[in-house]
Amino acid sequence: HEDHIGGVPYFLKQINIPIYAPRLAAGLIRNKLEEHKLLRSTTIIEIMQGQTIKLGKYFSVEIIRSTHSIPDSVMLAITTPVGTILHTGDFKVDFTPIDGKIMDLGRIAELGNQGILALMSDSTNAERKGFTMSESSVGDVFDKLFIHCTKRIVVATFASNVHRVQQIVNLAVKYGRKIAVCGRSMVNMIDTARELGYIDCPEDLFIDIDMIGTYNDEQLVIITTGSQGEPMSALTRMAAGDHRKVTITPNDLVIISANPIPGNEKFVSKVVDDLMQIGAEVVYSALADVHVSGHACQEEQKLIIALAKPKYFIPVHGEYRQLMAHAETAKQMGIDGKNIILMSNGRVLEINEEEAKLTTSVQSGKVLVDGLGVGDVGNIVLRDRQHLSQDGLIIIVLTMDSNTGEVVAGPDVISRGFVYVRESENLMDDVKSVVRHEIKKCEERDIRDWATIKSTVRENLKDYIFMKTKRNPMIIPIIMEV
Protein backbone atom coordinates (compact mmCIF):
# COMPACT_ATOMS: atom_id res chain seq x y z
CA HIS A 1 0.00 0.00 0.00
CA GLU A 2 1.06 3.61 -0.56
CA ASP A 3 1.51 4.28 3.18
CA HIS A 4 4.13 1.50 3.25
CA ILE A 5 6.16 2.35 0.14
CA GLY A 6 5.48 6.07 -0.45
CA GLY A 7 8.50 7.19 1.56
CA VAL A 8 10.97 4.78 -0.06
CA PRO A 9 12.42 7.25 -2.63
CA TYR A 10 13.08 9.86 0.06
CA PHE A 11 14.62 7.27 2.36
CA LEU A 12 16.92 5.98 -0.39
CA LYS A 13 18.24 9.49 -1.01
CA GLN A 14 19.59 9.36 2.55
CA ILE A 15 20.62 5.69 2.77
CA ASN A 16 21.06 3.71 -0.44
CA ILE A 17 20.51 0.07 0.60
CA PRO A 18 19.11 -2.99 -1.22
CA ILE A 19 15.32 -3.44 -1.17
CA TYR A 20 13.83 -6.89 -0.61
CA ALA A 21 10.19 -7.08 -1.69
CA PRO A 22 7.59 -9.52 -3.08
CA ARG A 23 6.97 -9.29 -6.83
CA LEU A 24 3.99 -6.91 -6.84
CA ALA A 25 5.49 -4.59 -4.22
CA ALA A 26 8.77 -4.62 -6.17
CA GLY A 27 6.92 -3.60 -9.34
CA LEU A 28 5.18 -0.72 -7.58
CA ILE A 29 8.43 0.42 -5.97
CA ARG A 30 10.17 0.38 -9.37
CA ASN A 31 7.48 2.70 -10.74
CA LYS A 32 7.98 5.06 -7.83
CA LEU A 33 11.77 5.04 -8.11
CA GLU A 34 11.55 5.67 -11.85
CA GLU A 35 9.53 8.83 -11.15
CA HIS A 36 12.29 9.99 -8.80
CA LYS A 37 15.08 8.93 -11.22
CA LEU A 38 16.48 6.49 -8.64
CA LEU A 39 15.78 3.16 -10.32
CA ARG A 40 19.22 2.67 -11.90
CA SER A 41 21.04 3.34 -8.64
CA THR A 42 18.85 1.02 -6.53
CA THR A 43 19.10 -2.73 -6.06
CA ILE A 44 15.69 -4.44 -5.79
CA ILE A 45 15.67 -8.13 -4.86
CA GLU A 46 12.39 -9.97 -5.37
CA ILE A 47 11.51 -12.44 -2.63
CA MET A 48 9.18 -15.43 -2.66
CA GLN A 49 6.93 -16.91 0.00
CA GLY A 50 8.69 -19.81 1.70
CA GLN A 51 12.15 -18.40 0.94
CA THR A 52 14.81 -17.87 3.63
CA ILE A 53 17.31 -15.02 3.24
CA LYS A 54 20.65 -15.03 5.06
CA LEU A 55 21.72 -11.63 6.36
CA GLY A 56 25.31 -11.73 7.51
CA LYS A 57 26.66 -14.30 9.95
CA TYR A 58 23.98 -14.21 12.62
CA PHE A 59 20.63 -13.35 11.05
CA SER A 60 18.22 -14.98 8.62
CA VAL A 61 14.71 -14.00 7.52
CA GLU A 62 12.06 -16.52 6.48
CA ILE A 63 9.23 -15.27 4.26
CA ILE A 64 5.85 -16.73 5.35
CA ARG A 65 2.71 -16.46 3.22
CA SER A 66 0.03 -14.22 4.76
CA THR A 67 -3.31 -12.74 3.66
CA HIS A 68 -4.27 -9.07 3.45
CA SER A 69 -6.04 -6.74 1.02
CA ILE A 70 -3.15 -6.89 -1.45
CA PRO A 71 -1.52 -9.96 -3.03
CA ASP A 72 1.88 -11.27 -1.92
CA SER A 73 1.42 -10.24 1.72
CA VAL A 74 3.98 -11.87 3.98
CA MET A 75 5.01 -12.35 7.58
CA LEU A 76 8.69 -12.36 8.54
CA ALA A 77 10.31 -14.90 10.87
CA ILE A 78 13.63 -13.32 11.84
CA THR A 79 16.15 -15.75 13.32
CA THR A 80 18.65 -14.13 15.70
CA PRO A 81 21.31 -15.53 18.07
CA VAL A 82 18.85 -15.27 20.99
CA GLY A 83 15.71 -16.58 19.27
CA THR A 84 13.14 -16.11 16.52
CA ILE A 85 11.08 -12.94 16.16
CA LEU A 86 7.84 -13.22 14.17
CA HIS A 87 6.55 -9.98 12.61
CA THR A 88 3.06 -10.37 11.14
CA GLY A 89 3.01 -7.24 8.98
CA ASP A 90 -0.53 -6.18 8.05
CA PHE A 91 -2.71 -9.30 8.03
CA LYS A 92 -6.12 -10.91 8.31
CA VAL A 93 -6.87 -14.62 8.41
CA ASP A 94 -8.85 -15.09 5.20
CA PHE A 95 -9.74 -18.70 4.46
CA THR A 96 -11.27 -17.84 1.07
CA PRO A 97 -8.86 -15.27 -0.43
CA ILE A 98 -9.43 -14.11 -4.00
CA ASP A 99 -6.14 -15.56 -5.26
CA GLY A 100 -6.65 -18.85 -3.39
CA LYS A 101 -3.38 -18.44 -1.45
CA ILE A 102 -4.27 -19.12 2.19
CA MET A 103 -2.06 -17.95 5.04
CA ASP A 104 0.58 -20.54 5.98
CA LEU A 105 -0.78 -21.21 9.46
CA GLY A 106 1.01 -24.56 9.52
CA ARG A 107 4.42 -22.91 9.28
CA ILE A 108 3.52 -20.45 12.05
CA ALA A 109 2.54 -23.43 14.23
CA GLU A 110 5.84 -25.20 13.43
CA LEU A 111 7.80 -22.12 14.45
CA GLY A 112 5.67 -21.85 17.59
CA ASN A 113 6.55 -25.43 18.53
CA GLN A 114 10.24 -24.72 17.92
CA GLY A 115 9.97 -21.61 20.11
CA ILE A 116 9.27 -17.99 19.21
CA LEU A 117 11.02 -15.42 21.32
CA ALA A 118 8.82 -12.45 20.40
CA LEU A 119 5.67 -11.87 18.36
CA MET A 120 5.09 -8.44 16.82
CA SER A 121 1.47 -8.40 15.66
CA ASP A 122 -0.84 -6.05 13.71
CA SER A 123 -3.14 -4.19 16.14
CA THR A 124 -5.31 -2.16 13.75
CA ASN A 125 -8.58 -3.95 14.59
CA ALA A 126 -7.67 -4.97 18.15
CA GLU A 127 -10.80 -3.26 19.50
CA ARG A 128 -13.13 -5.27 17.25
CA LYS A 129 -14.51 -8.60 18.43
CA GLY A 130 -14.93 -11.65 16.20
CA PHE A 131 -13.43 -12.28 12.76
CA THR A 132 -12.89 -9.96 9.81
CA MET A 133 -15.10 -11.00 6.90
CA SER A 134 -13.44 -12.57 3.88
CA GLU A 135 -12.65 -10.36 0.90
CA SER A 136 -14.74 -12.74 -1.22
CA SER A 137 -17.88 -11.66 0.70
CA VAL A 138 -17.63 -8.23 -0.96
CA GLY A 139 -17.87 -9.91 -4.36
CA ASP A 140 -21.18 -11.51 -3.35
CA VAL A 141 -22.60 -8.09 -2.39
CA PHE A 142 -21.28 -6.54 -5.61
CA ASP A 143 -22.91 -9.32 -7.62
CA LYS A 144 -26.31 -8.44 -6.19
CA LEU A 145 -25.75 -4.79 -7.15
CA PHE A 146 -24.54 -5.63 -10.68
CA ILE A 147 -27.04 -8.32 -11.63
CA HIS A 148 -30.12 -6.18 -12.33
CA CYS A 149 -28.40 -2.79 -12.76
CA THR A 150 -29.07 -0.98 -16.03
CA LYS A 151 -27.16 2.12 -14.94
CA ARG A 152 -23.52 2.98 -15.42
CA ILE A 153 -21.59 1.72 -12.38
CA VAL A 154 -18.86 3.81 -10.74
CA VAL A 155 -16.80 2.05 -8.04
CA ALA A 156 -14.44 3.98 -5.76
CA THR A 157 -11.92 1.97 -3.75
CA PHE A 158 -8.31 2.05 -2.59
CA ALA A 159 -5.98 1.84 -5.58
CA SER A 160 -3.83 -0.83 -3.96
CA ASN A 161 -6.74 -3.17 -3.16
CA VAL A 162 -5.96 -5.47 -6.09
CA HIS A 163 -8.25 -8.23 -4.79
CA ARG A 164 -11.19 -5.79 -4.83
CA VAL A 165 -10.34 -4.74 -8.37
CA GLN A 166 -10.15 -8.39 -9.44
CA GLN A 167 -13.68 -8.98 -8.17
CA ILE A 168 -14.94 -5.95 -10.10
CA VAL A 169 -13.16 -7.33 -13.18
CA ASN A 170 -14.85 -10.72 -12.72
CA LEU A 171 -18.29 -9.11 -12.50
CA ALA A 172 -17.66 -6.83 -15.48
CA VAL A 173 -16.81 -9.91 -17.56
CA LYS A 174 -19.81 -11.80 -16.19
CA TYR A 175 -22.29 -9.03 -17.04
CA GLY A 176 -20.73 -7.84 -20.30
CA ARG A 177 -19.39 -4.46 -19.19
CA LYS A 178 -16.21 -2.65 -20.20
CA ILE A 179 -13.99 -1.05 -17.55
CA ALA A 180 -12.52 2.46 -17.62
CA VAL A 181 -10.10 3.62 -14.94
CA CYS A 182 -9.92 7.08 -13.32
CA GLY A 183 -7.25 8.50 -11.04
CA ARG A 184 -3.49 8.41 -11.58
CA SER A 185 -2.72 6.03 -8.69
CA MET A 186 -5.48 3.64 -9.79
CA VAL A 187 -4.24 3.64 -13.40
CA ASN A 188 -0.65 2.97 -12.27
CA MET A 189 -1.68 0.20 -9.88
CA ILE A 190 -3.91 -1.63 -12.37
CA ASP A 191 -1.34 -1.31 -15.17
CA THR A 192 1.37 -2.79 -12.93
CA ALA A 193 -0.88 -5.55 -11.56
CA ARG A 194 -1.98 -6.57 -15.07
CA GLU A 195 1.58 -6.49 -16.38
CA LEU A 196 2.77 -8.78 -13.55
CA GLY A 197 -0.21 -11.12 -13.81
CA TYR A 198 -1.97 -10.19 -10.58
CA ILE A 199 -5.18 -9.18 -12.37
CA ASP A 200 -6.67 -11.84 -14.62
CA CYS A 201 -8.84 -10.40 -17.39
CA PRO A 202 -9.48 -10.45 -21.16
CA GLU A 203 -7.17 -8.18 -23.16
CA ASP A 204 -10.02 -6.00 -24.45
CA LEU A 205 -11.84 -5.54 -21.12
CA PHE A 206 -10.24 -2.20 -20.22
CA ILE A 207 -10.94 0.87 -22.35
CA ASP A 208 -9.49 4.38 -22.28
CA ILE A 209 -11.50 6.84 -20.20
CA ASP A 210 -11.88 9.00 -23.32
CA MET A 211 -13.92 6.19 -24.94
CA ILE A 212 -16.74 6.01 -22.38
CA GLY A 213 -18.98 8.21 -24.53
CA THR A 214 -19.09 5.50 -27.20
CA TYR A 215 -20.74 2.96 -24.87
CA ASN A 216 -24.20 2.77 -23.33
CA ASP A 217 -24.45 3.18 -19.56
CA GLU A 218 -25.31 -0.49 -18.98
CA GLN A 219 -22.08 -1.45 -20.77
CA LEU A 220 -19.72 0.42 -18.45
CA VAL A 221 -17.96 0.19 -15.11
CA ILE A 222 -15.67 3.02 -14.00
CA ILE A 223 -13.10 2.21 -11.30
CA THR A 224 -11.90 5.38 -9.60
CA THR A 225 -9.88 6.78 -6.73
CA GLY A 226 -11.45 9.07 -4.13
CA SER A 227 -13.03 6.66 -1.67
CA GLN A 228 -11.77 8.89 1.17
CA GLY A 229 -13.19 12.11 -0.26
CA GLU A 230 -9.72 13.54 -0.87
CA PRO A 231 -10.18 17.12 -2.15
CA MET A 232 -8.46 16.65 -5.55
CA SER A 233 -9.35 12.99 -6.12
CA ALA A 234 -11.28 11.80 -9.17
CA LEU A 235 -14.53 10.95 -7.35
CA THR A 236 -14.58 14.26 -5.47
CA ARG A 237 -14.18 16.16 -8.75
CA MET A 238 -16.92 14.05 -10.34
CA ALA A 239 -19.25 14.84 -7.43
CA ALA A 240 -18.48 18.55 -7.75
CA GLY A 241 -19.01 18.51 -11.53
CA ASP A 242 -15.36 19.42 -12.13
CA HIS A 243 -14.08 16.22 -13.74
CA ARG A 244 -13.06 16.69 -17.37
CA LYS A 245 -13.78 13.13 -18.48
CA VAL A 246 -16.70 11.86 -16.34
CA THR A 247 -20.01 13.62 -15.69
CA ILE A 248 -22.19 12.04 -13.00
CA THR A 249 -25.90 11.81 -13.86
CA PRO A 250 -29.03 10.30 -12.27
CA ASN A 251 -28.31 7.24 -14.41
CA ASP A 252 -25.22 6.35 -12.36
CA LEU A 253 -24.83 3.85 -9.52
CA VAL A 254 -21.87 4.94 -7.37
CA ILE A 255 -20.40 2.35 -4.99
CA ILE A 256 -17.96 3.66 -2.38
CA SER A 257 -16.12 0.49 -1.44
CA ALA A 258 -14.17 1.70 1.60
CA ASN A 259 -14.76 2.85 5.15
CA PRO A 260 -13.75 6.44 5.96
CA ILE A 261 -10.37 6.58 7.66
CA PRO A 262 -10.70 8.48 10.99
CA GLY A 263 -10.56 12.19 10.15
CA ASN A 264 -11.97 11.77 6.64
CA GLU A 265 -15.63 11.33 7.61
CA LYS A 266 -16.63 14.89 6.68
CA PHE A 267 -14.95 14.67 3.28
CA VAL A 268 -16.69 11.39 2.45
CA SER A 269 -20.07 12.71 3.66
CA LYS A 270 -19.67 15.77 1.44
CA VAL A 271 -18.97 13.60 -1.61
CA VAL A 272 -21.99 11.36 -0.86
CA ASP A 273 -24.22 14.43 -0.44
CA ASP A 274 -22.98 15.98 -3.68
CA LEU A 275 -23.57 12.74 -5.60
CA MET A 276 -27.07 12.38 -4.20
CA GLN A 277 -27.94 15.99 -5.05
CA ILE A 278 -27.03 15.22 -8.66
CA GLY A 279 -29.49 12.33 -8.45
CA ALA A 280 -27.05 9.43 -8.57
CA GLU A 281 -27.76 6.26 -6.61
CA VAL A 282 -25.05 5.90 -3.96
CA VAL A 283 -24.18 2.74 -2.03
CA TYR A 284 -21.60 2.88 0.77
CA SER A 285 -20.60 0.79 3.77
CA ALA A 286 -23.37 2.12 6.02
CA LEU A 287 -25.98 0.79 3.57
CA ALA A 288 -24.41 -2.49 2.39
CA ASP A 289 -21.35 -4.65 3.04
CA VAL A 290 -19.40 -3.20 0.12
CA HIS A 291 -16.16 -3.11 2.10
CA VAL A 292 -14.29 -5.39 4.47
CA SER A 293 -11.18 -4.58 6.43
CA GLY A 294 -7.79 -5.98 5.52
CA HIS A 295 -6.83 -6.32 9.18
CA ALA A 296 -7.43 -9.04 11.76
CA CYS A 297 -10.04 -8.73 14.50
CA GLN A 298 -9.65 -10.19 18.00
CA GLU A 299 -10.34 -13.85 17.19
CA GLU A 300 -7.77 -13.88 14.37
CA GLN A 301 -5.26 -12.16 16.64
CA LYS A 302 -5.91 -14.87 19.24
CA LEU A 303 -5.31 -17.57 16.62
CA ILE A 304 -1.88 -16.19 15.73
CA ILE A 305 -0.93 -15.87 19.41
CA ALA A 306 -2.11 -19.45 20.07
CA LEU A 307 -0.06 -20.84 17.16
CA ALA A 308 3.05 -18.77 17.80
CA LYS A 309 3.15 -19.23 21.61
CA PRO A 310 5.64 -16.35 22.01
CA LYS A 311 7.61 -15.61 25.16
CA TYR A 312 7.29 -11.86 24.56
CA PHE A 313 4.40 -10.08 22.87
CA ILE A 314 4.81 -6.68 21.20
CA PRO A 315 1.63 -5.18 19.68
CA VAL A 316 2.46 -2.98 16.68
CA HIS A 317 0.72 -1.03 13.89
CA GLY A 318 -2.03 0.88 15.68
CA GLU A 319 -2.94 3.83 17.85
CA TYR A 320 -2.00 3.46 21.52
CA ARG A 321 -5.53 2.44 22.49
CA GLN A 322 -5.37 -0.34 19.89
CA LEU A 323 -2.01 -1.51 21.21
CA MET A 324 -3.59 -1.58 24.68
CA ALA A 325 -6.55 -3.62 23.43
CA HIS A 326 -4.21 -6.09 21.72
CA ALA A 327 -2.14 -6.36 24.90
CA GLU A 328 -5.33 -7.22 26.81
CA THR A 329 -6.12 -9.95 24.26
CA ALA A 330 -2.62 -11.38 24.78
CA LYS A 331 -3.18 -11.46 28.55
CA GLN A 332 -6.42 -13.37 28.00
CA MET A 333 -4.38 -15.87 25.95
CA GLY A 334 -2.14 -16.52 28.95
CA ILE A 335 0.87 -14.35 28.15
CA ASP A 336 2.43 -12.93 31.31
CA GLY A 337 1.73 -9.19 31.58
CA LYS A 338 5.43 -8.62 32.34
CA ASN A 339 6.26 -10.05 28.92
CA ILE A 340 3.89 -7.75 27.01
CA ILE A 341 5.74 -4.66 25.84
CA LEU A 342 4.00 -1.54 24.53
CA MET A 343 6.38 0.64 22.56
CA SER A 344 6.20 4.15 21.16
CA ASN A 345 7.93 5.24 17.97
CA GLY A 346 11.65 5.63 18.50
CA ARG A 347 11.96 3.48 21.64
CA VAL A 348 14.64 0.80 21.60
CA LEU A 349 13.89 -2.69 22.94
CA GLU A 350 16.80 -4.95 23.88
CA ILE A 351 16.16 -8.69 24.24
CA ASN A 352 18.60 -11.32 25.49
CA GLU A 353 18.26 -14.84 26.89
CA GLU A 354 17.17 -13.56 30.31
CA GLU A 355 15.06 -10.45 29.75
CA ALA A 356 13.57 -7.84 27.45
CA LYS A 357 13.87 -4.19 28.42
CA LEU A 358 13.19 -0.79 26.96
CA THR A 359 16.38 1.24 26.84
CA THR A 360 17.13 4.45 24.98
CA SER A 361 15.24 6.31 22.26
CA VAL A 362 16.33 7.21 18.75
CA GLN A 363 15.16 10.10 16.62
CA SER A 364 11.90 9.33 14.85
CA GLY A 365 8.77 11.05 13.60
CA LYS A 366 7.38 12.62 10.47
CA VAL A 367 9.61 13.96 7.70
CA LEU A 368 7.39 16.34 5.77
CA VAL A 369 7.63 16.65 2.00
CA ASP A 370 6.66 20.09 0.69
CA GLY A 371 7.13 20.54 -3.04
CA LEU A 372 10.80 19.88 -3.69
CA GLY A 373 11.69 20.35 -0.05
CA VAL A 374 12.12 17.28 2.17
CA GLY A 375 12.30 17.73 5.92
CA ASP A 376 12.58 21.51 5.77
CA VAL A 377 9.01 22.15 6.97
CA GLY A 378 8.89 22.01 10.75
CA ASN A 379 6.35 22.66 13.47
CA ILE A 380 6.84 26.44 13.35
CA VAL A 381 6.07 26.60 9.62
CA LEU A 382 3.00 24.39 10.06
CA ARG A 383 1.84 26.53 12.98
CA ASP A 384 2.16 29.68 10.84
CA ARG A 385 0.19 28.06 8.00
CA GLN A 386 -2.55 27.00 10.38
CA HIS A 387 -2.64 30.50 11.86
CA LEU A 388 -2.95 32.05 8.39
CA SER A 389 -5.68 29.61 7.38
CA GLN A 390 -7.78 30.42 10.44
CA ASP A 391 -7.54 34.19 10.91
CA GLY A 392 -5.68 35.61 7.93
CA LEU A 393 -2.93 38.19 7.71
CA ILE A 394 -2.43 41.93 8.28
CA ILE A 395 0.71 43.68 7.02
CA ILE A 396 1.57 47.14 8.35
CA VAL A 397 3.97 49.11 6.12
CA LEU A 398 5.79 52.18 7.48
CA THR A 399 8.56 54.36 6.08
CA MET A 400 10.69 56.01 8.77
CA ASP A 401 13.61 58.43 8.78
CA SER A 402 16.64 56.47 9.96
CA ASN A 403 18.14 59.56 11.63
CA THR A 404 15.16 61.14 13.39
CA GLY A 405 12.89 58.10 13.79
CA GLU A 406 9.96 60.06 12.39
CA VAL A 407 7.32 58.46 10.17
CA VAL A 408 7.83 59.68 6.60
CA ALA A 409 5.03 57.68 4.95
CA GLY A 410 2.27 55.37 6.08
CA PRO A 411 1.15 53.46 7.90
CA ASP A 412 -0.44 51.48 5.06
CA VAL A 413 -2.49 48.40 5.89
CA ILE A 414 -2.67 45.29 3.70
CA SER A 415 -5.17 42.59 4.67
CA ARG A 416 -5.39 39.05 3.28
CA GLY A 417 -7.92 36.54 4.57
CA PHE A 418 -8.89 38.77 7.52
CA VAL A 419 -11.36 41.37 6.28
CA TYR A 420 -12.18 42.89 2.90
CA VAL A 421 -10.54 46.31 3.17
CA ARG A 422 -13.12 48.24 1.10
CA GLU A 423 -15.93 47.00 3.33
CA SER A 424 -14.05 47.61 6.58
CA GLU A 425 -12.68 51.12 6.14
CA ASN A 426 -13.55 52.17 9.70
CA LEU A 427 -11.64 49.24 11.15
CA MET A 428 -8.66 49.95 8.87
CA ASP A 429 -8.66 53.59 9.96
CA ASP A 430 -8.70 52.46 13.60
CA VAL A 431 -5.78 50.11 12.91
CA LYS A 432 -3.77 52.98 11.42
CA SER A 433 -4.58 55.15 14.44
CA VAL A 434 -3.37 52.44 16.83
CA VAL A 435 -0.12 52.11 14.85
CA ARG A 436 0.45 55.88 14.86
CA HIS A 437 -0.23 55.98 18.60
CA GLU A 438 2.28 53.22 19.33
CA ILE A 439 4.93 54.83 17.09
CA LYS A 440 4.44 58.12 18.90
CA LYS A 441 4.86 56.41 22.27
CA CYS A 442 8.10 54.86 21.04
CA GLU A 443 9.32 58.31 19.92
CA GLU A 444 8.49 59.79 23.34
CA ARG A 445 10.45 57.00 25.02
CA ASP A 446 13.31 57.50 22.53
CA ILE A 447 13.06 53.93 21.25
CA ARG A 448 15.00 53.74 17.97
CA ASP A 449 15.47 49.96 17.72
CA TRP A 450 13.38 48.71 14.78
CA ALA A 451 12.84 45.26 16.34
CA THR A 452 11.43 46.81 19.52
CA ILE A 453 9.19 49.16 17.54
CA LYS A 454 7.84 46.26 15.46
CA SER A 455 7.21 44.15 18.56
CA THR A 456 5.39 47.02 20.30
CA VAL A 457 3.19 47.70 17.27
CA ARG A 458 2.44 44.00 16.80
CA GLU A 459 1.46 43.26 20.41
CA ASN A 460 -0.73 46.32 20.94
CA LEU A 461 -2.41 45.99 17.55
CA LYS A 462 -3.06 42.32 18.27
CA ASP A 463 -4.88 43.22 21.50
CA TYR A 464 -6.92 45.93 19.80
CA ILE A 465 -7.99 43.75 16.86
CA PHE A 466 -9.00 40.90 19.17
CA MET A 467 -11.04 43.31 21.29
CA LYS A 468 -12.85 44.61 18.19
CA THR A 469 -13.27 41.39 16.18
CA LYS A 470 -12.51 38.44 18.51
CA ARG A 471 -10.09 37.29 15.82
CA ASN A 472 -6.36 36.87 15.94
CA PRO A 473 -4.76 37.42 12.49
CA MET A 474 -1.05 37.15 11.91
CA ILE A 475 0.40 40.68 12.08
CA ILE A 476 3.59 41.56 10.19
CA PRO A 477 4.94 45.12 10.64
CA ILE A 478 7.37 46.18 7.90
CA ILE A 479 9.54 49.26 8.50
CA MET A 480 11.47 50.75 5.61
CA GLU A 481 14.29 53.19 6.27
CA VAL A 482 15.06 56.37 4.31
What is each of the regions a protein language model found here?
Residues 1-215, 233-247, 266-270:
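His/Asp/Glu-rich metal-coordinating catalytic cores
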Residues 18-19, 314, 474-476:
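Short glycine-rich phosphate-binding loop at a beta-alpha junction
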Residues 44-46, 118-120, 254, 282, ...:
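Conserved beta-strand scaffold positions in the cores of enzyme catalytic domains, especially
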Residues 58, 73-75, 219, 391-395, ...:
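Broad gene-expression machinery/nucleic-acid interaction feature
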Residues 127-257, 261-430, 434-446, 454:
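Hard-cation-handling environments
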Residues 446-482:
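C-terminal tails and terminal domains of large nucleic-acid-associated
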